[in-house]
Swiss-Prot record:
InterPro entries per UniProt: 2-IPM_HCS-like (IPR050073), 4OH_2_O-val_aldolase (IPR017629), Aldolase_TIM (IPR013785), DmpG_comm (IPR012425), DRE_TIM_HOA (IPR035685), PYR_CT (IPR000891)
Keywords: Aromatic hydrocarbons catabolism, Lyase, Manganese, Metal-binding
Entry-linked Pfam families: DmpG_comm, HMGL-like
Organism per entry: Nocardia farcinica (strain IFM 10152)
Record's protein name: 4-hydroxy-2-oxovalerate aldolase 1
Any one GO MF annotation of this record: manganese ion binding
GO terms for biological process, alphabetical: catabolic process; L-leucine biosynthetic process
Length: 345
C-alpha cells in the first residue's frame, strides 16, 4: 500500500511543534520562517506548527510561548510554497474555536491527539474539522501502554468520527520493533480503506528510524519526524536519516536527501538550544515508558528540589502519568526530597 501514486509514504516534519518542547516554546517568527522555507525547499510535504502541547497550550502548566502560536501558523503558511501546514490539537487543552482560527491563518491539516484509550473525546473535534474542509489526522498517544487490539478499537472510533489517518504514537519512545509493527498491522486490518495509518516515534531507546521502517512494512503510509531530531525527550525520528534509509530501501518520500541534510545542519540546528541527546534522563523515559515532554519539566523540578531527574522519571513511569499531568512531577520531587532528608537523619 502506498500513500499515493507518487509517494510510498508522506512525511510530516514536527520540528516546529514537538521541537517546541525542547526549546521550551521560545520560537521566534524569524526561526519559523527560516525553518519552513528550508523544509519546504527540501520537499517536505507537511510541516506541523503549534505550541508543543498543541493549540492553546501556552499556559502556566505547559509553558508560555514566546511568540503567539497563531502568529507562527500564519508565518508558516505564508512562507511555504508547496508544503501543507498542520496544527496539533489536544481536546481539553485547545478548544474548537482554535481550529477555526488556525484554518483562517492558513493551516489545512488538523491533527487531534488523545490518550490511546480516550479516542471518544475527539469525536466532536473531528466532526468540526471535516465540516470546515480540513484534512484530519488522529493521534493515539502513549500507544505502548495498550495492546494492538485495544488500539484498533480506539482507531475505529476516530475513523468513524471523520479521522482520515490514525497514528500509532510512541510518545515515550518505548516501543521496540515488532511492538510497532504489531500495533500498526492491527490498526491497518481494522480500518481497511476507511482511513490511513501513521506512526510517530521518539528516540528515547534510539530506535525511531528502525521503528518507522517496521511501521511502513506493516502498512503505515504517513510517518512523522523532525529535522535534527528536534523534539521532546531524546527527540523525534530524524527526518534526514529517515529519508536516507528510505532512499536505500526504495521507499519514495519525495524529499531530497541532500537538501534535507543541509536544512537540518544549517537552519534547524542553529535554532536549537542544544542537541537532542540520548542522555540518562531520556533513556529512562524510553525504558520506563514516560511521556517525552516530561523531560524539561523533570529537569527543572529536579534542580529546584535537589533530587535526581532520572529517578523522578522512573517514578513517573510507575505512576503511568500521561500528558497533562506534568504537575505531578512536583509531588514526585517532594517525595524524593523527603526520602533524602529521612535518610540523612
Amino acid at each position: 500500500m502506498a500513500y499515493s501514486a507518487e509517494l510510498d509514504i508522506r512525511v510530516t516534519d514536527t520540528s516546529l511543534r514537538d521541537g517546541s518542547h525542547h526549546k521550551r516554546h521560545q520560537f521566534t517568527a524569524t526561526e519559523v520562517r527560516d525553518i519552513v522555507a528550508a523544509l519546504d525547499g527540501a520537499g517536505v510535504p507537511v510541516i506541523e506548527v503549534t505550541h508543543g502541547d498543541g493549540l492553546g497550550g501556552s499556559s502556566f502548566n505547559y509553558g508560555f510561548s514566546k511568540t503567539p502560536e497563531q502568529e507562527l501558523v500564519t508565518i508558516a503558511a505564508q512562507t511555504a510554497k508547496q508544503a501543507k501546514i498542520a496544527v496539533l490539537m489536544l481536546p481539553g487543552v485547545g478548544v474548537k474555536e482554535d481550529i477555526k482560527v488556525s484554518q483562517d491563518n492558513g493551516a489545512s491539516i488538523c491533527r487531534i491527539a488523545t490518550h490511546c484509550t480516550e479516542a471518544d473525546v475527539s469525536i466532536q473535534h473531528f466532526g468540526l474539522a471535516r465540516e470546515l474542509g480540513l484534512e484530519t489526522v488522529g493521534f493515539l498517544m502513549m500507544s505502548h501502554t495498550q495492546p494492538p487490539e485495544v488500539l484498533a478499537k480506539q482507531a475505529r472510533i476516530m475513523a468513524d468520527a471523520g479521522c482520515q489517518c490514525v497514528y500509532i504514537v510512541d510518545s515515550a519512545g518505548a516501543l521496540v520493533l515488532e511492538q510497532v509493527s504489531d500495533r500498526v498491522a492491527a490498526v491497518v486490518a481494522e480500518l481497511g480503506d476507511d482511513a490511513q495509518v501513521g506512526f510517530h516515534g521518539h528516540e528515547n531507546l534510539d530506535l525511531a528510524v528502525a521503528n518507522s521502517i517496521y511501521a511502513i512494512r506493516a502498512g503505515a503510509t504517513q510517518i512523522d519526524g523532525s529535522a535534527r531530531r528536534f523534539g521532546a525527550g531524546a527527540g523525534n525520528t530524524p527526518v534526514e536519516a529517515l529519508v536516507g534509509v528510505c532512499d536505500k530501501l526504495g521507499i519514495r518520500t519525495g524529499i531530497d536527501f541532500f537538501a534535507i541534510a543541509d536544512a537540518a545542519e544549517d537552519v534547524v540546528r542553529p535554532a536549537m538550544p542544544q542537541e537532542c541527546l540520548l542522555d540518562r534522563q531520556a533513556l529512562m523515559m524510553g525504558y520506563a515508558g514516560v511521556y517525552s515532554s516530561f523531560l524539561k519539566h523533570a529537569e527543572r523540578q529536579a534542580e529546584r528540589y535537589g533530587v535526581s531527574a532520572a529517578e523522578m522519571l522512573v517514578r513517573a513511569g510507575r505512576r503511568k502519568l500521561v500528558g497533562g499531568q506534568e504537575d505531578q512531577l512536583i509531588d514526585i520531587a517532594l517525595e524524593l526530597q523527603r526520602e533524602q532528608q529521612t535518610a540523612t537523619v
